[in-house]
């Protein structure tokens, strides 16, 4: 199957849409005189024209004004600052609160309770600040059996070497090191 390029696809789409819409424009009364002769125009005007028994009438300004008033629906804009009663006392997003509505005494009590329950971030992550020194009781206790980073790295390397040479064979790297050492020794 052949793949159609984008330009050809667009050209095909435009041609198809213009062909399909040309049929609808041709049946319109305004386009007929351009495509047909004046002889056939009478036939179309009789079919689509105004019946001979009715007269055209113009709409007066008063009728137009009355018609417009009946069909227009007036909508008031929604109030922007209206808050539902149930959500009036809730804090705003991201922990901000409206301070104007609270008394100073209530604000002090709330701040004291928050400080005791939630330490500041430097305290939580083991860093000390100048204003709040830590006591040894506040410091996280390190388990006695945990290894230091250098000891842990040494254990991992030893296990890796045991996996690489399980039968006591030396690894390639060890053999190269010994060869280099033998070459460096002076011959006697």
Swiss-Prot record:
This is Pro-FMRFamide-related neuropeptide VF. The modification Phenylalanine amide is found at residues 94, 125. GO terms for molecular function: neuropeptide activity. The keyword Nucleotide-binding does not apply. Belongs to the FARP (FMRFamide related peptide) family. PANTHER family: PRO-FMRFAMIDE-RELATED NEUROPEPTIDE VF (PTHR14403:SF6), RFAMIDE PEPTIDE GONADOTROPIN INHIBITORY HORMONE (PTHR14403). Residues 116-144, 163-188 are annotated as: Disordered. Residues 1-26 form the signal peptide. It comes from the Eukaryota. Residues 27-57, 97-106, 128-188 form a propeptide. It is found in: Secreted. GO terms for biological process: negative regulation of gonadotropin secretion; neuropeptide signaling pathway.
